[in-house]
Regions:
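P-loop NTPase switch/communication element
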Residues: 150-197
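P-loop NTP-binding catalytic core
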Residues: 57-58, 69-129, 169
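Conserved P-loop NTPase nucleotide-binding/switch module
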Residues: 202-203, 207-247
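N-terminal accessory targeting/assembly segments
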Residues: 1-87
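P-loop NTPase nucleotide-binding module
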Residues: 108, 119-164
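Residue-level signature of catalytic and energy-coupling elements of molecular machines
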Residues: 37, 91, 160
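Short, ordered loop/turn segments at secondary-structure junctions
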Residues: 42, 134-136, 161-164, 186-189, ...
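Well-ordered alpha-helical segments embedded in enzymatic catalytic cores
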Residues: 90, 118, 142, 190-196, ...
Length: 247
């Protein structure tokens, strides 16, 4: 079995934090299990780890600290998500009704090589596969590694709606290997990019981070039978489903 290798570019995420909060994260000395950093205006900052959530400091987050992170973050998309170029980290904003950012979730993105060993026979079967699971259990990590492995011998195109598979910026993260990546201007246009990927770029495999709308399911059905699709969907019941179409 392939040994797992993890890269996370964590310093790039810590660099956007105010220095006092960065030092608090580093003082926790548990970076390998760090999942998210939570900054909400008027509340104490916290860090979420695999097994616990801790308070980083007793001082409440100020407007200046929210603005500090906001100014060092890439532009937020229509879904209030942003990233850091050439990394897999995701920064999500909470806004008030006037549009000002009042909360931030900084999620650590990790490339984990070797994660698909247990299902490699499934992803190489030539069938379309839908991966089901709760948010945060590693569905995107599996898709990213599957795209890298399949791209060694097949034409793979990733439809990367939130830039979580290939990372932020115009150049995809090395973790996707030779797979090509198409970005999506707005989440509601994902189904159009799915169709465009098949019609314009002749893939043997398409990889979609999440299929959650009826139009996206319909777009998956229009793909020729020779094109297999790997995708994920949020659910409370983890599973892997073979499917001739996404239902």
């Amino acid at each position: 079995m392939t040994q797992h290798r993890i890269t996370d570019d964590l310093d790039a995420l810590l660099d956007v934090l105010p220095i006092n909060i960065r030092h608090a994260v580093e003082k926790a000395n548990n970076s390998e299990k760090l999942l998210e950093i939570i900054l909400d205006l008027g509340r104490v900052p916290t860090a979420r780890f695999v097994e616990e959530e801790i308070v980083l400091q007793e001082k409440e987050i100020t407007r200046a600290e929210i603005d500090y992170v906001d100014e060092r973050t890439g532009e937020f998309d229509a879904d209030n998500r942003a990233g850091i170029e050439r990394t897999l980290h995701r920064i999500s904003a909470i806004r008030n009704r006037r549009g000002a950012v009042v909360g931030l979730t900084l999620r650590v993105g990790r490339a984990v090589y070797g994660t698909v060993d247990i299902i490699q026979d499934i992803i190489e079967s030539g069938k379309s596969v839908l991966i089901l699971g709760r948010p945060g259990v590693g569905k995107t990590t599996l898709l990213r590694e599957a795209a890298r492995i399949l791209a060694e011998n097949k034409r793979v195109v990733i439809v990367d709606t939130s830039n979580e598979i290939g990372g932020d910026g115009d150049v995809p993260h090395p973790a996707v290997g030779r797979a090509r990546r198409m970005q999506v201007r707005e989440p509601m246009l994902q189904h159009e990019v799915m169709i465009e990927a098949v019609e314009n770029h002749n893939p043997e495999v398409t990889v979609i981070d999440e299929i959650g709308r009826e139009l996206e399911a319909a777009a998956a059905r229009t793909s020729p039978s020779a094109v297999c699709s790997l995708s994920a969907r949020h659910t409370d019941k983890p599973s892997i489903i073979f499917c001739s179409t996404q239902r």
